Amino acid sequence: MDPGDDWLVESLRLYQDFYAFDLSGATRVLEWIDDKGVFVAGYESLKKNEILHLKLPLRLSVKENKGLFPERDFKVRHGGFSDRSIFDLKHVPHTRLLVTSGLPGCYLQVWQVAEDSDVIKAVSTIAVHEKEESLWPRVAVFSTLAPGVLHGARLRSLQVVDLESRKTTYTSDVSDSEELSSLQVLDADTFAFCCASGRLGLVDTRQKWAPLENRSPGPGSGGERWCAEVGSWGQGPGPSIASLGSDGRLCLLDPRDLCHPVSSVQCPVSVPSPDPELLRVTWAPGLKNCLAISGFDGTVQVYDATSWDGTRSQDGTRSQVEPLFTHRGHIFLDGNGMDPAPLVTTHTWHPCRPRTLLSATNDASLHVWDWVDLCAPR
């Protein structure tokens, strides 16, 4: 039997729900608006790129399966066009505003999702201090009463801008030229940064720049690029920061001690990430100690980190771990099992359905999948 046919048969056992869609263009953005819709945006250069607000199939908008539903496809609720490639998009909570970043990275763009039509239109821009041809500002949003946009391409250019007044309310005010890979707002006063080098920091915006940080991810990190995500912030002690290297190294850290990883493991990736800009690690919002990684090939790997505390082999090297689940649908459905297989550009967890993820690839496919934990007791 053809490998693709084998996978289709096996998928009946592997998935509770599975949907495959074709977008008009590849996306690096999957941004939730409530639990029923997502934004996607194209990132091709030298062309207009679509920004779309997609409504999920009705079956995925309910917490329990209650029979058959007629709608089995995404519906386009709103749309617009950007003259730039879009590498990041953030929805400003409790508003109809979006903030996008991409190349050329000389400014951020603010968009409004219309109430009385299906249009997403550009309404303003936010100036960027650091203007470099090859770098684009990372973006995060403080969802306070007066929303603030955190952005920067390097540590020295980090700042928070009030979205309404456009006044700068916080700056790093340092000369450090480290390149950023990700920014994440944790609460009304705190954000996390990850540098491409693996340097991590937690910043309190009520104080001058004095981050709680590590300076590097540890031995063996030369030449790697890194990304990170903080999960379950403020919910007690424990390893709530996951840091992923382009060679498949995955570190879990406790925010109270960023210099000493709680565990350091090696994920089974066949080759280093071909495009470290696409590296992604995410914590499952509805499953304890569960996370997913992508950006190495056409798969998304899901891990249970419950037993990883202190994980190292006797000679001090990192131990290899095996995923709890691997989504290979993009390879067999979109790539037909052929090389080069599609590359996953991003993934995200559904905010309410514990085992449901969305994933997209560079061939413009979008999958929604609810995986079955085959190791769980029946």
From Swiss-Prot:
It is found in: Cytoplasm; Cytoplasm, Cytoskeleton, Spindle; Cytoplasm, Cytoskeleton, Spindle pole; Cleavage furrow. InterPro entries: WD40/YVTN_repeat-like_dom_sf, WD40_repeat_dom_sf, WD40_rpt, Wdr73. WD repeats lie at residues 73-113, 121-163, 167-205, 214-255, 266-305, 322-371. GO terms for cellular component: cleavage furrow; cytoplasm; spindle pole. Expressed in kidney and brain. In the kidney, expressed in glomeruli, most probably in podocytes, and in tubules (at protein level). In the brain, expressed in the cerebellum, with high levels in Purkinje cells and their projecting axons, in the deep cerebellar nuclei and in pyramidal neurons of the cerebral cortex (at protein level). In the white matter, mainly present in astrocytes, but not in oligodendrocytes (at protein level). Also highly expressed in endothelial cells of cerebral capillaries (at protein level). It comes from the Eukaryota. One of its GO terms (molecular function) is protein-macromolecule adaptor activity. GO terms for biological process: cytoplasmic microtubule organization; nucleus organization. Keywords: Cytoplasm, Cytoskeleton, Disease variant, Epilepsy, Intellectual disability, Repeat, WD repeat. Coiled coil: none annotated. Component of a multiprotein complex required for the assembly of the RNA endonuclease module of the integrator complex. Associates with INTS9 and INTS11 in the cytoplasm, stabilizing the INTS9-INTS11 heterodimer and blocking the active site of INTS11. BRAT1 then joins the complex and plugs the active site of INTS11, leading to WDR73 release and nuclear import of INTS9 and INTS11. It is linked to Galloway-Mowat syndrome 1: A form of Galloway-Mowat syndrome, a severe renal-neurological disease characterized by early-onset nephrotic syndrome associated with microcephaly, central nervous system abnormalities, developmental delays, and a propensity for seizures. Brain anomalies include gyration defects ranging from lissencephaly to pachygyria and polymicrogyria, and cerebellar hypoplasia. Most patients show facial dysmorphism characterized by a small, narrow forehead, large/floppy ears, deep-set eyes, hypertelorism and micrognathia. Interacts with INTS9 and INTS11; the interaction is direct. Part of the multiprotein complex composed of BRAT1, WDR73, as well as integrator complex subunits INTS9 and INTS11. Belongs to the WD repeat WDR73 family. This is Integrator complex assembly factor WDR73. It comes from Homo sapiens (Human). The gene is WDR73.
